[in-house]
């Protein structure tokens, strides 16, 4: 009894003094906090303003992303305030960087509505990124408790079911984005789809910004694209698909387009990240109900994920999108034209594909994560890749990926079908070499040259793009190892 009185007295004297007191003193810092299995954990990279103690800055982030405001409020006493306060429990300096710190924060599960990415993000990234106490702030990683994950649907279809529907096993999926992304008529667009699929690709896809413009309305695109899919499937004797982008201005429009895509026989539809978390979850629920694969283009992500000191690491987006329920997400190529450190991208892929992940600091995984049996998301590698890189792509990314060669198919001098054939032959020759036990990474260029002896389109592709690489040092690399972007 005496301890209870003493505890209440301490809380009242330290936590509920009127006016403005430090966040750490208000209880948002607790170095002795014992993490619960049901806690949501977040890791922030903080850059405090000059003169701001990193512990106080961490406590401020914990407070402002949970229950605090700038001054003490007596209405906290009407809540289970000790439970609901987020707790910053650990602060580490960032290796080899001055004035940056990793702040570990724990949130009670009851702070979040079940099954809502929108509610989760309203707290975790809602106000704190504009907080004056920090010069910059970045959300690096999160751990979701199993109890919380069980309130989410997860991927509508998942990798295993997609492979069964497509009847494609033992190799990556092959795809391409229609180019140019804007300006084609419906008939010409459908011709591109047909040529690419007939040449050997599994998928063609719309790009992120093709919706329903004056040069080609959405229904026209859907009809001509599916005509191409059906003709190519019949000619090749394989199951083929085209990602029909149903992104639109309103949910009503997206529903209409998605339902029409189903009516005309598509097995997959597509949305953009920019439609927002609630719309993404809504379309994922629709996709599962209608047995459709749901592809997500990460349009817009680099506006907040690329810079190392402020914004949000893409691995967090990967986690949220697996919870939200998409089946595909663009997650980097390593060797292509877009940002992508090898270790960082490996961390993204593991986040999307593994049932459990352990702490792996070189890959940027700060927490162990049990995915509570949520289905796997298929990563998509797209942007500046070509047949001559096939050994690198297979080595870095493995089998469970969609390799999308847009320009690397449609830019082929002998035509779209030839470009698709070059990519299919390159992939199958590399997979065969791997399955035979050869060192396909070291022997990759020779394996491709040998395959090209009986495949003219592949020889043309190798000659055309042999000197093309995008070997820049990534802006976002692991803090615990030096890993320049590799393009051998």
Curated annotation (Swiss-Prot):
- Catalytic class of the enzyme: lyase
Sorted UniProt keywords = Calvin cycle, Carbon dioxide fixation, Chloroplast, Lyase, Magnesium, Metal-binding, Monooxygenase, Oxidoreductase, Photorespiration, Photosynthesis, Plastid
The enzyme's E.C. designation = 4.1.1.39
Name of the molecule in the record: Ribulose bisphosphate carboxylase large chain
Where does the record place the catalytic residues? Answer: 179, 297
Q: Which amino acid positions bind substrate, per UniProt? A: 127, 177, 181, 298, 330, 382
Q: What job does the chain carry out? A: RuBisCO catalyzes two reactions: the carboxylation of D-ribulose 1,5-bisphosphate, the primary event in carbon dioxide fixation, as well as the oxidative fragmentation of the pentose substrate in the photorespiration process. Both reactions occur simultaneously and in competition at the same active site.
Q: What CDD domains does the record tag this protein with?
A: RuBisCO_large_I
The species this protein belongs to is Pyropia haitanensis (Red seaweed)
Which residues are recorded as modified (N6-carboxylysine)? 205
The family annotation for this protein states: Belongs to the RuBisCO large chain family. Type I subfamily.
């Amino acid at each position: 009894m005496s301890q209870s009185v003493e505890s209440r007295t301490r809380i009242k004297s330290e936590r509920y003094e009127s006016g403005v007191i430090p966040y750490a003193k208000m209880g948002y810092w607790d170095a002795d906090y014992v993490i619960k299995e049901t806690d949501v954990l977040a890791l922030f990279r903080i850059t405090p303003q000059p003169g701001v103690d990193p512990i106080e800055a961490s406590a401020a982030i914990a407070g402002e992303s949970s229950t605090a405001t700038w001054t003490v409020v007596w209405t906290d006493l009407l809540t289970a305030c000790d439970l609901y306060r987020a707790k910053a429990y650990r602060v580490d300096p960032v290796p080899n960087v001055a004035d940056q710190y990793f702040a570990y924060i724990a949130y009670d599960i009851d702070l979040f509505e079940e099954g809502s990415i929108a509610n989760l993000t309203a707290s975790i990234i809602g106000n704190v990124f504009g907080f004056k106490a920090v010069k910059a702030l970045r959300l690096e990683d999160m751990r979701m408790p199993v109890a919380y994950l069980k309130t989410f649907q997860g991927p509508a279809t998942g990798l295993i079911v997609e492979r069964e529907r497509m009847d494609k096993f033992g190799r990556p999926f092959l795809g391409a984005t229609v180019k140019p992304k804007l300006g084609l008529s419906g008939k010409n667009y459908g011709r591109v789809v047909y040529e690419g699929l007939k040449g050997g690709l599994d998928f063609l896809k719309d790009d992120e910004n093709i919706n329903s413009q004056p040069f080609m309305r959405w229904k026209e695109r859907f009809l001509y694209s599916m005509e191409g899919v059906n003709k190519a499937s019949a000619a090749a004797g394989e199951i083929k698909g085209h990602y029909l982008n149903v992104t639109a201005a309103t949910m009503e429009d997206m529903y209409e387009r998605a339902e029409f895509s189903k009516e005309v026989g598509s097995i997959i539809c597509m949305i953009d990240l920019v439609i927002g978390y609630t719309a993404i979850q809504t379309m994922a629920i629709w996709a599962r109900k209608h047995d459709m694969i749901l592809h997500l283009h990460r349009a817009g992500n680099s506006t907040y994920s690329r810079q190392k000191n402020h914004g949000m690491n893409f691995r967090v987006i990967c986690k949220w999108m697996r919870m939200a329920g998409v089946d595909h997400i663009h997650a980097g190529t390593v060797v292509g034209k877009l940002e992508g450190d090898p270790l960082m991208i490996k961390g993204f892929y593991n986040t999307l594909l593994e049932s459990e992940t352990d702490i792996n600091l070189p890959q940027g995984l700060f927490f162990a994560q049990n995915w509570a049996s949520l289905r796997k998301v298929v990563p998509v590698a797209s942007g500046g890749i070509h047949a001559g890189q096939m050994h690198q792509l297979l080595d870095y990314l493995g089998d469970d990926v969609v390799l999308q060669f847009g320009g690397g198919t449609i830019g082929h001098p002998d035509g779209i079908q030839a470009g698709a054939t070059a990519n299919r032959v390159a992939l199958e020759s590399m997979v065969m070499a791997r399955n035979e036990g050869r060192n396909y990474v070291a022997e990759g260029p020779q394996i491709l040259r040998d395959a090209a002896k009986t495949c003219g389109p592949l020889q043309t592709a190798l000659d055309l793009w042999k000197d093309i690489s995008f070997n820049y040092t990534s802006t976002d690399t692991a803090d615990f190892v030096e890993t320049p972007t590799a393009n051998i």
